[in-house]
Amino acid sequence: MEEIQRYLQPERSQQHDFLYPLIFQEYIYAFAYDRGFSRSILSENPGYDNKSSLLIVKRLITGMYQQNHFLISPNDSNQNPFGARNKNLYFPIISEGFAFIVEIPFSLRLISCLEGKKIVKSQNLRSIHSIFPFLEDNFSHLNFVLDILIPQPVHVEILVQTLHYWVKDASSLHLLRFFLNEYCNWNSLITPNKASSSFSKRNQRLFLFLYNSHVYEYESIFVFLRNQSSHLRSTSSGVLLERIFFYGKIERLVNVFVKVKDFQANLWLVKEPCMHYIRYQRKSILASKGTALFMNKWKCYLVTFWQWHFSLWFHPRRISINQLSNHSLEFLGYLSSVRMNASVVRSQIIENSFLINNAIKKFDTFVPIIPLIASLAKAKFCNVLGHPISKPVRADLSDSNIIDRFGRICRNLSHYHSGSSKKKSLYRIKYILRLSCARTLARKHKSTVRAFLKRLGSELLEEFLMSEEDVLFLTFPKASSTLRGVYRSRIWYLDIISINDLANHKSKF
């Protein structure tokens, strides 16, 4: 049993990963910058970030070498601890370097799993790609759902302590702690505002990594819920062993929870065979076929678990209980709900015929049309009612360049929302973009839309549809004959992680 428990424990780093010397290597920052630059696929003109030049990196490393944190003088009160006069200039560089360095032990562990040196455990399913089978699951038999807003740590020290279980290099952790305390306001990092001039999307990588490591510890207590209902569940005995060890964790937690007044921990609470769990960013969903009382017990359990195990204040209002038949799940930029599909069946017995009305529950995932139209209206592609309008463009842009920009936006939206079961809203978005493109070109040439489309022919339509044919051929080579198959099938693309800004409907078009 001890061997089983040792295997099922969250994998920790058993060796000392000496990461501290890497902080002073120039190539680390070059790799970090190159990775962030190559992933900016949504920006039209990424350009070159002059704040990440090699000369500035050399000055930063020299300043860190020469800085002595044990010597404190009155003249150093306004001095930057890393030898930098401009905090906003050096903060993104250090953040990118730290993010690249602390991910090294996790990357090495993943590579060893892929090479077959270790068994790939269920924790590896906790990625953005595990959301796809979750949305494909059959929810029609479920009754209630918990919408959970995961609390954020009140202090960065909690994050550093969590990372200490994985990385045993004390020097790098001390420097990371010093950097976070000196530069960072945790609340503004998780929920950045427009007034923060030193904050950018690329600088979020380090803090999201620390936050996800923290949530990983929280999810380890009931990760088996995702395995049971997922299409990715393992067929080996690993899931059974994991569940046995999970009950052992719950029994140990009972000794803690019984100290709370009016609280009783029941093991049957976590033995419900039909539970669905998934998380994306700070929001998680827990669905079950249980009763309202059953879900209230889960709510009480989660609140107590956060407060006692993580020393975080978790307000009960962060968890809402909703009946699935009257509630839509907002997740990953999709809306999912259980709907009643009515059907009429004619039954005939000898000379008598009967009409039988059947109501079948169906779980549908569709595109949230209202937020998308609001985003398009904000970007001047249409008005608030969804009517396409012309977009002002520079006079030096060629027609092919304008068509390519509109087509790229349309392809990204179509690519991202291709997993929806209802395509009608997606057709409307594509219609808005296509007509807006035509009106923009007609405005540039001082012509009417009808005359311009007649002169342009099918070129504009091919630009908006050609990419879908190519993707269909790569994904389903046996069904690439008709375009109709694209609209009816549900396709989940694995590179959706690169364009997940569309989930927040705040993408800059």
UniProtKB/Swiss-Prot annotation:
Q: Name one GO cellular component term.
A: chloroplast
Q: What is an example of a GO molecular function annotated in this UniProt entry?
A: RNA binding
Write one Pfam family the protein is assigned to: MatK_N
Q: Which UniProt keywords apply?
A: Chloroplast, mRNA processing, Plastid, RNA-binding, tRNA processing
Annotated localization: Plastid, Chloroplast
Cite a single GO BP annotation.
tRNA processing
Q: Which domain of life is it from?
A: Eukaryota
The Swiss-Prot or TrEMBL record describes its family as follows: Belongs to the intron maturase 2 family. MatK subfamily.
The entry's function note states:
Usually encoded in the trnK tRNA gene intron. Probably assists in splicing its own and other chloroplast group II introns.
Q: What is this protein called?
A: Maturase K
Q: What is the lineage of its organism?
A: Eukaryota, Viridiplantae, Streptophyta, Embryophyta, Tracheophyta
